[in-house]
Amino acid sequence: MHKPASPFGGAVAGTELGPLRITVSATANERYWASAGVDHPTLRQGALYPPVAANLAILLFQTVATRPLLHTAQRLISHRRGEAGTELTVTGTVVERYEKRGREYAVVDALVALPDGEPLWTSIATFCEQ
């Protein structure tokens, strides 16, 4: 008999995620700014586009939750400015799992850090499986 896979790759509250190391190139960063329709002086100064933190939280969670996900909620906290081309380290924890209307949900608290370990962004994301 076939047993269905555990939701979210078996990740439960307390599951540690990462580290995931990633560099957002200047070209990719510019695409993020442009897709939002934003032309801001900090872009021309090389600043990373802060909402990219949401994508990094998704990539981090997908290292364990490999089935299709719906990204249902997001909260971002920006701690400081980061520069495009800088290696970022993303770590996190599944802080909550719950069921609502017959669907399983997971809340992930992810920290995006600069090479010196200082926090750049905190991303709190909620997911459900499709």
For each of these PLM feature ranges, what is it?
Residues M1-A73:
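Hot-dog-fold acyl-thioester-processing enzymes
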Residues M1-F8, G82-Q130:
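HotDog/MaoC-like acyl-thioester-processing domains
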Residues H40-L43, S78, Y98:
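Short helix-to-loop capping/linker segments positioned immediately adjacent to catalytic or ligand/cofactor-binding
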Residues P50-V94, E104, I124:
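Hydrophobic beta-strand-centered segment that forms part of the acyl-chain substrate-binding groove
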